[in-house]
Amino acid sequence: MHMIRRAAGALAVFAVAALAAAPAWAATAQEQLDTFVATVKGATGSFKQSTVSPQGATQPAQSGTFAFQRPGKFKWAVQLPYEQLIVSDGKQVFQYDPDLAQVTVRQVDQAIGTSPAAILFGAGQLSQAFAVSALPDRDGLQWLRAKPRNADAGFSQVDIGLRDNQPARIELVDAFGQTTRVELSNLLPGAVPASEFQFTPPQGVDVVKM
């Protein structure tokens, strides 16, 4: 169970970052990414997430809400089947598991690494870290793929599907061959209050700094 929770936390970072990577479908995928990173500063929405192993085994589906604000701030709040909160204030990433009474704290750079989060939080050229390409349309969505150039990124690829110029689905294949699908809804671009990204560990919980 603890391993599943840790994996879910890492995938939450992937999902928020991949969301921020999805631009309006216009020119090339690279041009769209560059434009989106330069112009979209934040958004809120809802998600449903499921993970399937290479053998077809499924983990319990998750659902909740998210928010992000460039650069470096995000909130991923799992509501079902169990509560979990992941918050970045731009410097540190806090993962809070209420039923474990534990908060894990990591530096943003350590938590993000070379994941798709670099698309959201990074300030450099995307082409330095990712190979971005267009994919054929499917399921009524337009798709692009981002593949990390770093072999130690922890995932092999992330695909982003768009509808009506908004991200609707993210499909990430991790280093173990697991596929995580995140369905996005109620997406509302716009500034998010700084208070959304503030987190103080509740009194009495264990705080583990990584």
Curated annotation (Swiss-Prot):
Known partners and oligomeric status: Monomer.
Gene Ontology biological process terms from the UniProt entry: lipoprotein localization to outer membrane; lipoprotein transport
Source superkingdom: Bacteria
Keyword Iron: no
Main location: periplasm
Signal peptide: 1-26
Annotated localization: Periplasm
Alphabetized NCBIfam families for the sequence: lolA, PRK00031.1-3
Gene3D superfamilies given in the database record: Lipoprotein localisation LolA/LolB/LppX
Family: Belongs to the LolA family.
Free-text function comment from the UniProt entry: Participates in the translocation of lipoproteins from the inner membrane to the outer membrane. Only forms a complex with a lipoprotein if the residue after the N-terminal Cys is not an aspartate (The Asp acts as a targeting signal to indicate that the lipoprotein should stay in the inner membrane).
HAMAP family referenced in this protein's UniProt entry, alphabetically: LolA
Keywords: Chaperone, Periplasm, Protein transport, Signal, Transport
Protein name (record): Outer-membrane lipoprotein carrier protein
GO cellular component: outer membrane-bounded periplasmic space
